[in-house]
């Protein structure tokens, strides 16, 4: 975003994403494979903190919690995310004044009361102003001894995460982020596969660190609609994790048993013509099914990305490396869309 874009909420990036499942061991196993060891345990609740780089994942398995109620409704899911802000109390008051719905306040004795509002699909958006050297985890969590088993995969931060919404609701949620946090649209996509299509508005915070593409289907059979049916509503579709070496990261994750979506063989035949001057090894890309996009000839750099299979209900992860490109892989959307359509055909959805 432009440095002059007003930032009334003082946003400064993602602090964490919170996950839940009726069987939380599924999440613990997955996070182990992704290279996220348990680094802390909540002092009084069945909640664990998993970290790699500047990415914080929380598993909430507390029995009588909002998270577990969310899991009963949606299945394995991402029930909350947290934004870093300059002043959480101010941001919370301002959000309510602008029409946000307050989230549940459930802090116990000697626990931080982190303000939150209702977000996509009834999930929560926490507002956190303690991060970095002084963090929310210092109060509520007890550090765990370093794991000798977890092999990190080089993931550095949350690059972006996406929302899937009902048809006709994309502009509603874009407006939500515009009104409350002064997000701006930085990309608009209209993607048509061979049988299905989607619309997407990529929204970015004034600080430039919180990016949320919002996806809407153009028909009743796309992967967006499949997600909405399986998830029983709108929600977070995928979380994109950044790396400085996507080849090494993918190799480590595959060795841990993480499965990725494939790319059509024909995709790599057109890479040199579509992304001229990219300087990547086609063999290395093809071998790992990594996608590439960008326009280095116009000084826009390249972007490398790959997507896991669905791993938390209908939710999946993206691994992304930016080499001077600030897009979302628009040129890859069609290739990804077609590869997911092929999977839908195999599973009898299409």
Where are these regions (language model features)?
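C-terminal, well-structured subdomains that either form a transmembrane helix-short loop-helix hairpin
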Residues: 235-238, 242-244
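An N-terminus-focused feature that recognizes amino-terminal "leader" regions
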Residues: 1-143, 160, 167, 305
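Terminal peptide-recognition signature
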Residues: 81, 177, 239, 314
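Extended non-catalytic domains of envelope/secretory-pathway proteins
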Residues: 8-11, 174, 231, 235
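TerminUS-proximal long segments
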Residues: 1-7, 309-350
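Loop-centered beta-sheet repeat module
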Residues: 151-205
């Amino acid at each position: 975003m432009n440095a002059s874009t007003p930032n009334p909420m003082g946003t400064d990036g993602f602090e964490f994403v919170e996950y839940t499942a009726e069987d939380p061991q599924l999440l613990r196993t997955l996070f182990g494979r992704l290279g996220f060891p348990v680094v802390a345990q909540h002092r009084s609740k069945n909640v664990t903190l998993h970290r790699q780089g500047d990415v914080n994942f929380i598993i909430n398995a507390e029995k009588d919690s909002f998270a577990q109620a969310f899991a009963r409704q949606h299945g394995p899911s991402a029930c909350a995310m947290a934004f870093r802000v300059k002043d959480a109390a101010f941001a919370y008051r301002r959000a309510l004044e602008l029409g946000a719905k307050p989230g549940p306040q459930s802090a116990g004795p000697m626990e931080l009361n982190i303000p939150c509002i209702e977000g996509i699909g009834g999930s929560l958006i926490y507002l956190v102003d303690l991060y970095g050297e002084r963090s929310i985890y210092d109060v509520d969590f007890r550090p765990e001894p370093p794991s000798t088993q977890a092999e990190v995969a080089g993931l550095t931060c949350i690059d972006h995460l996406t929302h899937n919404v009902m048809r006709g609701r994309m502009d509603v949620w874009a407006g939500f982020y515009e009104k409350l946090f002064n997000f701006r649209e930085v990309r608009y996509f209209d993607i048509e596969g061979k049988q299905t299509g989607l619309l997407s508005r990529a929204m970015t915070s004034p600080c430039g660190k919180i990016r949320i593409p919002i996806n809407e289907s153009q028909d009743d059979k796309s992967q967006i609609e499949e997600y909405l049916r399986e998830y029983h509503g709108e929600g977070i579709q995928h979380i994109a994790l950044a790396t400085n070496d996507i080849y090494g990261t993918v190799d480590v994750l595959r060795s841990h048993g993480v499965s990725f979506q494939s790319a059509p063989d024909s995709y790599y035949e057109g890479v040199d013509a579509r992304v001229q001057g990219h300087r990547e090894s086609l063999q290395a890309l093809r071998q790992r099914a990594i996608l590439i996009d960008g326009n280095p000839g116009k000084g826009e750099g390249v972007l490398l990305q790959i997507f896991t299979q669905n791993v938390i209900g209908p939710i999946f992860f993206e691994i992304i490396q930016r080499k001077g490109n600030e897009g979302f892989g628009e040129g890859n959307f069609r290739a990804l869309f077609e590869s997911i359509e092929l999977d839908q055909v195999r599973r009898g959805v299409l």
